[in-house]
Amino acid sequence: MTRVRRGYIARRRRTKIRLFASTFRGAHSRLTRTITQQKMRALVSAHRDRGRKKRDFRRLWITRINAVIRGSGVSYSYSRLIHDLYKRQLLLNRKILAQIAISNRNCFYMISNQIIKSGECEEFNGII
């Protein structure tokens, strides 16, 4: 029986996997079985962390806004600020508010003071 030469399909598949894992350390970038295992693990982690990244950034923005609000000296909290923003129908999301709070505090203080003033006027109008 004559010798049969194998095709290139399996080799092409393995080189594709090796290119994916070329930055991994140790046997994870050299041995085919461990490469496939690490590739699956990396893709699972990437899928999980795409959702986690959104949550982490939202937490960071909320923390930054709250820190600047509480540092202003006025007894005002993040939750009251967001509540008043929604009441006034101001379309500023948490990402933009956090960027304003970090880069331009005076502008952020002006926004929050304007909201506080308009909130106090409405409360007095409701009492009288």
UniProtKB/Swiss-Prot annotation:
Keywords: Chloroplast, Plastid, Ribonucleoprotein, Ribosomal protein, RNA-binding, rRNA-binding
Molecular functions (GO terms): rRNA binding; structural constituent of ribosome
GO cellular component: chloroplast; ribonucleoprotein complex; ribosome
NCBIfam families listed in its UniProt record: rplT_bact
Stored Pfam families: Ribosomal_L20
Major site of localization recorded for this protein: plastid
Descriptive protein name: Large ribosomal subunit protein bL20c
Gene name linked to the record: rpl20
Subcellular location field: Plastid, Chloroplast
Keyword Chloroplast: yes
Family (UniProt): Belongs to the bacterial ribosomal protein bL20 family.
Function: Binds directly to 23S ribosomal RNA and is necessary for the in vitro assembly process of the 50S ribosomal subunit. It is not involved in the protein synthesizing functions of that subunit.
Alphabetical GO biological process terms: ribosomal large subunit assembly; translation
Native source organism of the sequence: Piper cenocladum
Presence of keyword Ribosomal protein: yes
Database matches in Gene3D superfamilies: 6.10.160.10, Ribosomal protein L20
